[in-house]
């Protein structure tokens, strides 16, 4: 499965310079570290996130993450699962309470190397490290009820694409990640209409 993922990332066309450089970094770690799918790798490990949109693709689910003290996309650690799409769907279901989630495409929607500062989790010190993140475009019905995952989030909701950017307190995400995801969503929808 790891080789399949490497091939998929090799074929991925970067959207911008950030993705171009991050693609190289992710491939380097995948090729050179056997434990890259486990958070026991204290330098870097694979994570999967999603841009979870509604049926009309004009709203996205954002959760207020306790750890980051900010609204953020949904996602999590691969923890040994070498299929990041499955991880993104699983995490989206766990964090939102939604069960009707589907992938709009099985392809990688976006990729990023995310710097994580040292922090305390479950009363344990976690050193600074990198998340080698693959993002997937997922969809759910916005009339179905959302449910807070209390051990991770304190609020969750559907937000307009612009609101999703503005409610985040994480500057790097507000400037570099969420606007990029919205731009890519717009291009994806235009391509799908052709």
Q: Can you say where each PLM-predicted feature lies in the sequence?
A:
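Generic secondary-structure boundary/loop-capping signal
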Residues: 34, 43, 68, 75, ...
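Unchanged
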Residues: 79-172
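N-terminal strand-loop-strand
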Residues: 38-73
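Generic N-terminal amphipathic, Lys/Arg-enriched alpha-helix
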Residues: 1-13
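Acidic, metal-coordinating catalytic segment for phosphate/diphosphate chemistry
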Residues: 11-49
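Charged phosphate-binding loop/patch that engages nucleotide di/tri-phosphates or the phosphate backbone
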Residues: 169-194
